[in-house]
C-alpha cells in the first residue's frame, strides 16, 4: 500500500509505519525526509523510533538505516542518545537496528564512552547474544578503540578468545575484518 505524502500530510507517516513496509515505501519515506530543509521531518521520524508501538519504532529505525550518506549526517547529533538507547534496549531487533545506525557514524577520539566499550565487550563474549549483534559489537569496539594500542591489544585478546567457539559466517567475517586491522 503506497502512501502519497506532502508536508501537511505527515500524519500518514505513523500510519505507514504500522504495517510491514515495502522497499518502495522505505524509499518514499527517505525521499520525504531528505535534505536539510526536512530536518523537522527527520526529527518526527526519529521520535517515532521511540513509539510505544513496536512495529512503528522498528520501521522508523529501519527507515533510518536506508538514509543516504548526506541525510545520515543528521543522525550524528543523536550519537550519545543512540548509545544510551543501546545500553538500555532489551528488544534485539531494535538493538540491532540502533547498532547499524551507530556503525554509520564516526567515533572521535575525544568522545569515546567507556560504558559503550564495556557494552560491546559484554556482547562480543556473550555466546547467547544474537550473532548479528555480536558482529556489530566487534566492529563498533574496533571503531572506538582504534586510537589506543593498549585497548586494541585487549580487543585482540578478546577476539582470539572467541575464535575457539563456533562462529556463524557473519560473525566470522566481522572477526576476520577486525583482526586484519589489528
Enumerate the language-model features and the residues they cover.
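Alpha-helical scaffold domains
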Residues: 3-182
Amino acid at each position: 500500500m503506497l502512501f502519497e505524502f506532502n508536508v501537511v500530510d505527515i500524519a500518514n507517516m505513523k500510519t505507514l509505519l504500522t504495517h510491514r513496509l515495502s522497499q518502495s515505501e522505505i524509499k518514499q519515506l527517505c525521499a520525504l525526509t531528505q535534505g536539510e530543509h526536512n530536518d523537522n521531518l527527520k526529527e518526527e521520524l526519529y521520535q517515532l523510533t521511540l513509539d510505544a508501538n513496536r512495529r512503528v519504532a522498528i520501521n522508523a529505525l529501519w527507515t533510518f538505516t536506508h538514509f543516504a550518506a548526506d541525510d545520515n549526517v543528521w543522525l550524528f547529533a543523536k550519537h550519545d542518545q543512540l548509545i544510551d538507547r543501546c545500553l538500555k534496549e532489551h528488544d534485539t531487533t531494535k538493538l540491532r537496528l540502533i547498532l547499524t545506525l551507530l556503525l554509520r557514524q564516526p567515533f572521535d577520539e575525544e568522545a569515546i564512552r567507556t560504558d559503550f566499550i564495556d557494552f560491546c565487550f559484554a556482547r562480543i563474549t556473550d555466546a547467547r547474544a544474537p550473532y548479528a549483534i555480536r558482529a556489530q559489537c566487534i566492529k563498533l569496539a574496533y571503531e572506538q578503540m582504534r586510537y589506543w594500542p593498549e585497548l586494541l591489544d585487549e580487543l585482540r585478546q578478546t577476539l582470539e578468545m572467541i575464535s575457539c567457539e563456533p562462529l556463524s559466517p557473519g560473525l566470522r567475517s566481522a572477526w576476520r575484518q577486525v583482526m586484519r586491522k589489528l
